[in-house]
From Swiss-Prot:
Gene source species: Pseudomonas putida (strain ATCC 47054 / DSM 6125 / CFBP 8728 / NCIMB 11950 / KT2440)
InterPro entries the UniProt entry points to: AB_hydrolase_1, AB_hydrolase_fold, Carboxylesterase_BioH
Pfam families assigned to the protein according to its UniProt record, in alphabetical order: Abhydrolase_1 (PF00561)
Gene3D superfamilies: alpha/beta hydrolase (3.40.50.1820)
Protein name: (R)-3-hydroxydecanoyl-ACP:CoA transacylase
């Protein structure tokens, strides 16, 4: 399953690496939005869950992954800017659906508040309108380690917290990925954490009141950081919100085990294609280079 690769110019300011997994029989296209500093490799399992029922689009933010060499990294990028990049990609690919993971949910909600004309449904996974105590501790420690450029501590942070339920092989890839990032990527992550702690999430929630499409919020039963109970508070902000719980899953959902993978896939397809029963996809273990890092 080889994607069509393109590097797109976004309003003359950024160049964004994209992968388009075309499915000839698919009628709809979905864009996947990852957490900060995660790359297209993080969505390998999700692509297998959604393709070939959908055309699937992956992309790297200008500061990360395969977009990184195409941009000068002269300035930090806000969640609002990420939202505008997403809107450009939605327009370019004429995407019918979007799906976000973890803190990719902030830019996704900001983009959906603009009511993009093509998008009919959205899935927001492992995200919460509440920064609870475990998440605040995670963000505070992340801010401290990133400011000090402490690669060892940054490399272990995700595995010890939101990634605690991941298979050991995923954790090794996470550590290798995070501890080898460029200094500008650490600065970008530090900037995003400060945005969150300085009420950037509140701005996203205020805009969410403008969202006029169905949005499914998916959270793991074992996730202490974006809990099922906290996620349900999205009903106060998103008018057409729905909620699903993935049993035996933590923050990383379909990456964690076979049962969670199958349950996540069934929930996603049940929401996005409710009239169609799809054949079950086989769960495939992590491949070389795949990581689960997100913030």
């Amino acid at each position: 399953m080889r994607p069509e690769i393109a590097v797109l110019d976004i309003q003359g300011q950024y160049r964004v690496y994209t992968e388009f997994y075309r499915a000839d029989a698919a009628e709809n296209t979905i864009i996947l939005i990852n957490g900060s500093l995660a790359t297209t490799a993080s969505f390998a399992q999700t692509v297998r869950n959604l393709h070939p029922q959908f055309n699937v689009v992956l992309f790297d933010q200008p500061y990360s992954g395969k977009s990184k060499p195409h941009n000068r990294q002269e300035r930090l990028i806000s969640k609002e800017t990420e939202a505008h990049i997403l809107l450009e990609l939605i327009e370019h690919f004429q995407a019918d659906h979007v799906m976000s993971f973890s803190w990719g949910g902030a830019s996704t909600l900001l983009a959906l508040a603009h009511q993009p004309r093509y998008v009919k449904k959205a899935v927001v996974s492992s995200f919460s309108p509440v920064i609870n105590e475990p998440m605040r501790d995670y963000l505070d420690r992340g801010c401290q380690y990133l400011a000090a450029c402490d690669r060892y501590q940054v490399g272990n942070l995700v595995n010890d917290t939101i990634g605690k339920h991941l298979p050991s092989l995923f954790k090794r890839f996470n550590y290798r990925h995070v501890s080898s990032l460029d200094s500008h990527e650490y600065a970008q992550m530090h900037f995003h954490i400060n945005q969150v702690l300085e009420h950037d999430l509140e701005r996203a929630l205020q805009g969410a009141r403008n969202i006029n499409i169905p949005v499914l919020f998916i959270n793991g039963e074992r996730d202490e950081y974006t809990t099922v109970e906290d996620a349900r508070q999205f009903s106060k902000h998103v008018g057409r919100s729905q909620f699903s719980v993935i049993r035996d899953a933590g923050h990383f959902l379909d990456m964690e085990n076979k049962t969670a993978c199958e349950n996540t896939r069934n929930v996603m397809l049940g929401f996005l294609k409710p009239t169609v029963r799809e054949p079950r996809q086989r769960y495939q273990p992590v491949q070389q280079g795949q990581h689960a890092f997100a913030i």
